[in-house]
Curated annotation (Swiss-Prot):
This is Chaperone protein DnaK. Induction: By stress conditions e.g. heat shock. It comes from Borrelia garinii subsp. bavariensis (strain ATCC BAA-2496 / DSM 23469 / PBi). It holds the Pfam family HSP70. InterPro entries: ATPase_NBD, Chaperone_DnaK, Heat_shock_70_CS, HSP70_C_sf, HSP70_peptide-bd_sf, Hsp_70_fam.
Length: 635
């Protein structure tokens, strides 16, 4: 069995790790970073950029640079109204009602899983470069509070990236694995995970290699992006007061504000104030305008207090659902970059009555845990068992629009539950089964995961037919539902594919697109390498030509100069084969210089040897004399 990599597919950053010799290792990307920005961009030439290179051009290309796409994964268009306001790129309604991104530079509408797949491909390639072998399998993490549609979308993203997703693991659970891999004693741990776009809290019991999740809760609309947004709104307001100019509709200015807000937020975790300086942020009739502002930690904490407080209720619910008191918890682990905010650390202490444990790297713990889970699946990591839970209750709509729950939230997975229902009307020959996820009493107030029809039921008075509905949740938290008429034995099964999910044909098309992109990326890399080789040869040849111009014939010199000129002209074209052939021609032409350099070097060596009283070995006579002396010694 090959290596299974562990990927933390984050809202802001992603990270990849692998098990080596029983230890998890975080893999550096090609730029030397241990985490990679979860950013994908398309240039005006249609070139795709992923990671740091995409982040570097955000300000100048805001509408075609996609960040925080995780907020739109598996979501219907009407569910993301608040998220749309937070991003400069265009979100549209897809044909099946899901949220999609319109990318003007490639004139294409793309789904969130397709965009996330680009980041996963970068993670896959990072691991392949490190391991020196092809990678096809992965464990990918998701927020614990992700619903079925969001989990399925994540799995689809993996498939598009050419990865078989062996397991979907909840982020707090993965972090607990990273924390507890070498712990032997029993303890109860809370994982407080505040990332770029989501918040999760999970309570786990650890002991003897068993990691059992007791409860989980969270908010998939709360994360570091929201904290950045508060700073942005404040800066826009202050600038408007000062200059009477509203920056809220200037996409390029908003992108600069986004970068500055994120930087200030990070600075305020270690300093009492942060200076924000954005020269030439805009202009009016009087000339350019500059934004200068000093944000204090006290002001920042005042601005984001409502967000900090929003994390309290999920924590209290999780403690209650686990059947515990805050004092029963032995350790509180912080995960996610936003947990570095002092106000967050303070509320964690207030909720749990203890200082949080800072022994786990909040940026890498989730990927490390995913790698450990990969090791468990391959058998490389032994004596460890992970028992996770479903975050939300599952059920069906019954008479009167009520949600009847079959599986309660925080049930250990995998699990299966069945219940017998009947018809609501006389002579009813089919039933429409609506599958729901959520905690509300009425069906309409919960999320419809999907629906299917069981027909062919024999006509009978209402209440007579016996229809068994079975829910099956696999280890990834993905739901499978079946309905069976007990009288006829007729059965209907479905794996829930949300109404906002991708169809198999769409996924297949996206896989082909991703493969085409991989080919494009390969060609682009070849092109860059060919140009780099050519430029290097031109530089070396021109330098050598200058140095040895008096020692080579005018004909050779002219021939070399012509080849340099031809190669320079080919660099303006995108023809790799032409660049390579002309590079080879210049290489051959420049051999004349190499001969002169070698001859010059040989003469210099001979001169040095004579000065040291050593006879030169370059002449034929010298070689013979040396041979004869050696021969005499042998006699």
């Amino acid at each position: 069995m090959g290596k299974i990599i562990g990927i933390d597919l984050g809202t802001t950053n992603s990270c990849v790790a692998i098990m080596e010799h029983g230890k998890p290792v975080v893999i550096q990307n090609s730029e030397g970073g241990r985490t990679t920005p979860s950013i994908v961009a398309y240039t005006n030439k249609g070139e795709r950029l992923v990671g740091q290179v995409a982040k570097n051009q955000m300000v100048t290309n805001p509408e075609n640079t996609i960040y925080s796409i995780k907020r739109f994964m598996g979501r219907r268009f009407e569910e993301v109204a608040s998220e749309i306001k937070m991003v400069p790129y265009k979100i549209e309604k897809g044909l099946n009602g899901d949220a999609r991104v319109n990318i003007s530079n490639i004139k294409k509408q793309m789904s969130p899983p397709e965009i996330s797949a680009a980041t996963l491909t970068k993670m896959k390639e990072t691991a392949e470069a490190y391991l020196g072998e092809k990678v096809t399998e992965a464990v990918i993490t998701v927020p614990a509070y992700f619903n079925d549609a969001q989990r399925q979308a994540t799995k689809d993203a993996g498939k598009i990236a050419g990865l078989e997703v062996k397991r979907i693991v909840n982020e707090p659970t993965a972090a607990a694995l990273a924390y507890g891999i070498e712990k032997k004693h029993e303890e109860i741990v809370a994982v407080y995970d505040l990332g770029g776009g989501t918040f999760d809290i999970s309570i786990l019991e650890l002991g003897d290699g068993v990691f059992e999740v007791k409860s989980t809760n969270g908010d998939t609309h709360l994360g570091g992006d929201n904290f950045d947004d508060e700073i942005i709104k404040h800066l826009i307001s202050e600038f408007k007061k000062e200059s009477a100019i509203d920056l809220s509709n200037d996409k390029m200015a908003l992108q600069r504000l986004k970068e500055a807000a994120e930087k200030a937020k990070i600075e305020l975790s270690g300093a009492q104030e942060a200076s924000i300086n954005l020269p030439f942020i805009t202009a009016d009739a009087n000339g350019p305008k500059h934004l200068q502002y000093t944000l204090t930690r006290a002001k920042f904490e005042q601005m984001v207090d409502h967000l900090v407080q929003k994390t309290k209720e999920p924590c209290l619910k999780a403690i209650k659902d686990a059947g515990l008191k805050a004092s029963d918890i032995n350790e509180v682990i912080l995960v996610g970059g936003s947990t570095r905010i002092p106000a967050i650390q303070k509320i964690v202490k207030d909720i749990f009555g203890q200082d949080p444990n800072k022994g786990v790297n909040p940026d890498e713990a989730v990927a490390i845990g995913a790698a450990i889970q990969g090791g468990i699946l391959t058998g490389e990591t032994k004596d460890m068992v992970l028992l996770d839970v479903t975050p939300l209750s599952l059920g069906i709509e019954t008479l009167g629009g009520v949600m009847t729950k079959l599986i309660e939230r925080n049930t250990t997975i995998p699990t299966k539950k069945s219940q017998v229902f009947s018809t609501a009307a006389d002579n009813q020959t089919s039933v429409d089964i609506k599958v729901l996820q959520g905690e509300r009493e009425m069906a309409a107030q919960n999320r419809i995961l999907g629906n299917f029809i069981l027909d062919g039921i024999p006509a009978a008075p209402r209440g007579v037919p016996q229809i068994e509905v079975s829910f099956d949740i696999d280890a990834n938290g993905i739901v499978h539902v079946s309905a069976k008429d007990m009288g006829t034995g007729k059965e209907q099964k479905i794996r829930i594919e949300s109404s906002s999910g991708l169809s198999e044909s769409e996924i297949d098309r996206m896989v082909k697109d991703a493969e085409a992109h991989a080919e494009e990326d390969k060609k682009l890399k070849e092109n860059i390498e060919a140009k780099n080789t050519a430029n290097s040869l031109i530089y070396q040849t021109e330098k050598s030509l200058k140095e040895y111009s008096e020692k080579i014939s005018s004909e050779d010199k002219e021939a070399i100069e012509n080849k340099i000129k031809e190669l320079k002209e080919s660099l303006d074209k995108e023809d790799i084969s032409l660049i390579k052939s002309r590079t080879e021609e210049l290489q051959k032409a420049s051999y004349k210089i190499a001969e002169m350099m070698y001859k010059d070097s040989s003469q210099q060596n001979a001169s040095n040897q004579q000065e040291n009283g050593t006879q030169s070995n370059t002449s034929e006579e010298g070689k013979e004399a040396d041979y004869e002396v050696v021969d005499e010694d042998k006699k």
